[in-house]
Amino acid sequence: AELYLSYAEACIAYNKDGYLEKGMVKLDRIRERAGLLSVKDSWKNEKNPIVSYEGNGGLNGKLTEIVRQERMIELYLEQQNFWDIRRWKLGDKYFNVPVKGMNIDATDINGFATVKTLPDVRNFDTPRQYLLPIPAAEVSKNPNMVQNPNY
């Protein structure tokens, strides 16, 4: 699934002749495996329906948003989400917000569906945390190497 998602993401970002369709075929295969409708069928009743892939590609297109959402869902417990968000440079959108979760102390289905805001605060320091520090030993070996900003 990760290869199909990466392929779909690359095709959508490339946004050239036929690549949007190729990428969405891979994404729809993942959705089909999970028993879900295709992207077009799922989004046809939305406020801004997707009736054609053309015009929805590129880094800021609707298809990019969809493939990112699918990636977060499909790779949920594989510890990939944190790295994807950093790679997409969306730390402020996903990390510097209140943490929400389920009410796990509930005794019925209605209680579980209640969203709780947790007191924990996650701080993501942008742009610093988009990069990792280069180990000091490596920087000292090469006088031409410069440490990443703010480290």
PLM regions: where:
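Acidic/polar-rich alpha-helix caps and helix-coil junctions
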Residues: 2-151
